[in-house]
C-alpha cells in the first residue's frame, strides 16, 4: 500500500522573501511546503528535506541560493514528515513512488516546458529518508540524491517498502529501522557521513558507505559539517558534486532529432540487422524500459529509447507521433546501416504504439519487422496528466479500434497473467498474438524474460 503523499494544490499563498518569492503549498501530508522559484527558466528541480527550526536562516539561504542558480527548490520539513509516517495506517511506506508522483504533479502544476527528474537533498533526518527513496525507486527515476550528515537508521514504526532495492533490518536494542547498503549500482548518490558521532556511531556509517557500489557513490568530507552550517562550503561542495553530472539517461541528440527525448543503447558483441525503438512507460526511461533495452543490447540489438514522460509532457497527436517516428526510423536506419526495425512499447508507450504504426509512411512501415506491445491497456493518452496515474483522461483514445487495423508487420502483445488492466486477451488473435508471462504489470521484475520473449518473436538475423 502506498503512503498516498499527493499534492493538494487547492491554493497557493505567496509571501515575499528577499530576491525570490517563496510560495507556500498547503498539503495535508507535508503541512506547508515552501517552494523557491527562480525568476527565469528552470534548469533543475531539487527537493530539500530538512528539519524546520534547525539552522532555519541557513536553510532559507540555501533555498534562495539554489533558486538564483535557476533551480526550483521544494522545501519539506523532514521532522514533521517523519512524525506523520509514525501514525500511517499502511502495510509499508513507499517514499520513492510517492515523491515520483508528486514531482510529476508539481512540475505539471508550474507548467515547466519539459520534465526534470528531480534531485533530492536531505539533511539530518532527511538524509536517511532521501537514501530510502533512492533505493525504493527504479534506477534513474530521480536525477540524483545527496544525503548530508547521513546516518543509516531511521525512527519509524511502519516498515519501509522494499521497492526496487531497499533492504532494512529492525535494530533489536533501539527499535529503530536500520538501512542496509544497496546490492547493485543505482541512481547517483552523493553522501556526507555524520563523522561527529553525535547522531549515530560514525564507524557504522563509514562501514555502510564502504559497502556500497562505488560506481554511483561520491563521499564528501569537510571539517565543517552541514549540521553546523547547511548553507556553507561543505553543503555547496556536495551539491556541486550532485549537479555536476548529466541526468541519467540523457544523451545529446543529433541536430535532426534534437527535439526528441532519445537515449541510445549500443549493442554488445556481434550486431544484428535490426535495431529497436522502445517507447517507455509514463514514468520515463527507467525500470523495465532500461532493463529490457540493456538485455536486447546484450544480444546484439541496438536500441533507441524514447522517453514517453518527456515526449508527452506537452500535448501530441497520433499524426505528430508517427511523423516523429518516420524521422527517427529514417535517421537510425541510415546511421546504423540496419534495414529492419522493431517497434516496442511498454505501458503508455504500448498504448500509443498502434496509433503510430497505423500512420507510418510506406517507407518506414516497410522497415518494421515486429511490433511488440507490453502492458497494453484500453485507452491511450497523448499528453501527460497527473490524473492519468489514476485513470484515463477525458482526451484518451480507445486502443482496440487501432489494434483492429494492425496487419503486417507481425504484432505481439505481452501481458502479466495477474494484470487486471491488460487488454491483450481482447485483441483479434489473427492480427496480434497475445503472450502471457508470470506476474502483473511489472512482471515480478523479471524484465529479462520480457526481452527474451521479444527476441523469440523477432527471429533476428546476424
Cite the ranges covered by each PLM segment.
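N-terminal cap/lid segment of alpha/beta-hydrolase-fold proteins
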Residues: 20-41, 228-271
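The feature captures the conserved acid-bearing segment of alpha/beta-hydrolase catalytic domains
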Residues: 37, 152-211, 381-435, 439
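Short, surface-exposed "cap/lid" segments of acyl-processing enzymes
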Residues: 38-70, 77, 266-301, 305-308
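Short beta-to-alpha linker loops that shape the active-site pocket of alpha/beta-hydrolase fold enzymes
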Residues: 72, 77-82, 151, 302, ...
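Catalytic histidine neighborhood in serine/cysteine hydrolases
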Residues: 74, 210-229, 302-305, 429-444
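Cap/lid segment of the alpha/beta-hydrolase catalytic domain
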Residues: 79-94, 282-284, 307-320
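Alpha/beta-hydrolase active-site loop
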Residues: 89-112, 315-336, 351-355
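Primarily recognizes the serine-hydrolase "nucleophile elbow" in alpha/beta-hydrolase
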Residues: 109-174, 331, 340-394, 402
Amino acid at each position: 500500500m502506498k503512503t498516498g503523499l499527493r499534492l493538494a494544490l487547492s491554493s497557493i499563498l505567496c509571501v515575499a522573501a528577499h530576491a525570490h518569492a517563496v510560495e507556500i503549498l498547503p498539503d495535508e501530508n507535508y503541512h506547508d511546503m515552501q517552494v523557491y522559484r527562480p525568476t527565469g527558466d528552470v534548469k533543475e528541480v531539487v527537493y530539500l528535506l530538512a528539519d524546520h527550526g534547525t539552522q532555519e536562516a541557513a536553510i532559507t539561504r540555501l533555498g534562495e541560493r539554489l533558486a538564483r542558480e535557476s533551480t526550483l527548490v521544494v522545501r519539506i520539513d523532514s521532522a514533521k514528515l517523519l512524525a506523520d509516517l509514525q501514525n500511517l495506517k499502511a502495510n509499508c511506506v513507499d517514499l520513492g513512488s510517492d515523491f515520483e508522483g508528486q514531482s510529476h504533479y508539481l512540475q505539471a502544476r508550474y507548467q515547466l516546458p519539459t520534465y526534470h527528474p528531480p534531485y533530492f537533498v536531505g539533511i539530518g533526518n532527511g538524509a536517511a529518508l532521501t537514501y530510502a527513496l533512492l533505493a525504493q525507486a527504479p534506477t534513474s527515476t530521480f536525477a540524483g540524491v545527496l544525503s548530508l550528515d547521513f546516518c543509516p537508521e531511521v525512527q519509524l514504526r511502519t516498515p519501509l517498502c522494499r521497492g526496487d532495492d531497499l533492504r532494512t533490518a529492525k535494530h533489536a536494542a533501539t527499535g529503530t529501522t536500520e538501512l542496509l547498503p544497496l546490492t547493485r549500482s543505482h541512481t547517483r548518490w552523493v553522501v556526507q557521513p555524520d563523522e561527529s558521532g553525535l547522531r549515530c556511531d560514525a564507524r557504522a556509517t563509514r562501514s555502510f558507505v564502504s559497502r556500497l557500489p562505488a560506481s554511483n557513490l561520491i563521499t564528501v568530507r569537510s571539517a565543517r559539517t552541514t549540521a553546523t552550517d547547511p548553507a556553507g562550503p561543505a553543503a555547496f561542495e556536495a551539491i556541486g558534486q550532485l549537479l555536476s553530472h548529466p541526468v541519467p539517461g540523457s544523451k545529446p541528440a543529433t541536430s535532426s532529432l534534437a527535439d526528441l527525448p532519445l537515449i541510445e543503447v549500443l549493442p554488445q558483441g556481434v550486431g544484428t540487422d535490426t535495431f529497436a525503438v522502445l517507447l517507455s512507460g509514463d514514468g520515463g526511461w527507467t525500470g523495465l524500459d532500461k532493463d529490457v533495452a540493456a538485455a536486447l543490447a546484450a544480444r546484439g540489438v541496438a536500441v533507441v529509447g524514447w522517453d514517453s514522460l518527456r515526449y508527452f509532457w506537452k500535448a501530441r497527436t497520433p499524426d505528430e507521433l508517427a511523423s516523429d517516428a518516420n524521422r527517427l526510423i529514417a535517421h537510425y536506419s541510415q546511421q546504423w546501416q540496419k534495414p529492419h526495425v522493431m517497434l516496442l512499447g511498454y505501458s503508455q508507450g504500448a498504448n500509443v504504439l498502434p496509433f503510430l504504426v497505423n500512420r507510418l509512411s510506406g517507407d518506414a512501415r516497410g522497415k518494421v519487422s515486429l511490433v511488440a506491445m507490453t502492458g497494453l491497456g484500453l485507452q491511450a493518452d497523448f499528453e501527460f496528466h497527473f490524473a492519468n496515474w489514476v485513470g484515463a483522461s477525458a482526451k484518451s483514445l480507445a486502443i482496440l479500434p487501432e489494434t483492429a487495423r494492425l496487419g503486417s508487420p507481425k504484432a505481439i502483445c505481452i501481458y502479466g497473467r495477474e494484470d487486471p488492466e491488460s487488454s491483450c486477451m481482447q485483441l483479434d488473435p489473427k492480427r496480434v498474438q497475445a503472450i502471457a508471462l508470470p506476474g502483473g504489470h511489472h512482471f515480478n521484475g523479471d524484465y529479462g524474460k520480457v526481452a527474451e520473449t521479444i527476441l523469440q518473436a523477432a527471429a533476428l538475423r546476424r
